[in-house]
């Protein structure tokens, strides 16, 4: 992941999508 630490960052992306 270019922005951070793989799955942890993907989870953050999901959180933003659900927000």
Curated annotation (Swiss-Prot):
GO terms for cellular component: extracellular region. Keywords: Copper, Oxygen transport, Secreted, Transport. One of its GO terms (molecular function) is oxygen carrier activity. The keyword Membrane does not apply. Hemolymph. The keyword Transport applies. It is found in: Secreted, Extracellular space. Hemocyanins are copper-containing oxygen carriers occurring freely dissolved in the hemolymph of many mollusks and arthropods. Belongs to the tyrosinase family. Hemocyanin subfamily. Composed of 3 major subunits (IB, II and III) and 1 minor subunit (IA) which form homohexamers and heterohexamers. May also form larger structures. This is Hemocyanin subunit III.
